[in-house]
């Protein structure tokens, strides 16, 4: 549990905010120097997501998606804008959202809202989103704040909408990264938080073809 590794919650959040302020607004910056894995990541995410957009009567709509911890819009640009009519972005770092407006190019016109906010304080508009995409950011929330955020996301879904979490998974327990002020949880801890938020797990998949030295990365589809 994060309560065992985070001593000062306020400092946990403020330190992360300070860390991201000094990161360059580039794809490499967003991926901690692993910009070269972006295509592998996005191609797998597309396949994972499209199975829900193609299903029969319960298929997920393609009107509107929300990109959480969006940064400069790496996922918005390459995954969400090609599949959804409009996209909203939320990120804690103002400079990243400012950069997104040029990085996204012409298609960026279809980004409806740029919300500058930490996810612990963010509430998606109820019944608004077909897909809420949460990638490489859950480690910046405490267990309690993550469960509460997921509950708010559940209320933000349209009929047949889904939440996707894609993130690093620890081998065991919860590991604190003091550099960027984040935690990495093991699979069972994440599944437990998902259940506590009243969500069902529709699919779970491990990302393949990533460098050996980084954490295992898993995707979860939830409703």
From Swiss-Prot:
Positions of modified residues (N-acetylmethionine): 1
Gene Ontology MF terms: histone methyltransferase activity; N-terminal protein N-methyltransferase activity; protein methyltransferase activity
Compartments it resides in: Nucleus
Gene3D superfamilies: Vaccinia Virus protein VP39
Keywords: Acetylation, Methyltransferase, Nucleus, S-adenosyl-L-methionine, Transferase
InterPro entries given in the database record: MeTrfase_NTM1, SAM-dependent_MTases_sf
SUPFAM superfamilies reported for this sequence: S-adenosyl-L-methionine-dependent methyltransferases (SSF53335)
Gene Ontology annotations for the cellular component aspect, listed alphabetically: cytoplasm; nucleus
Main subcellular location: nucleus
Family named by the database record: Belongs to the methyltransferase superfamily. NTM1 family.
Function: Distributive alpha-N-methyltransferase that methylates the N-terminus of target proteins containing the N-terminal motif [Ala/Gly/Pro/Ser]-Pro-Lys when the initiator Met is cleaved. Specifically catalyzes mono-, di- or tri-methylation of the exposed alpha-amino group of the Ala, Gly or Ser residue in the [Ala/Gly/Ser]-Pro-Lys motif and mono- or di-methylation of Pro in the Pro-Pro-Lys motif. Some of the substrates may be primed by NTMT2-mediated monomethylation. Catalyzes the trimethylation of the N-terminal Gly in CENPA (after removal of Met-1).
Full protein name: N-terminal Xaa-Pro-Lys N-methyltransferase 1
Source species of the chain: Rattus norvegicus (Rat)
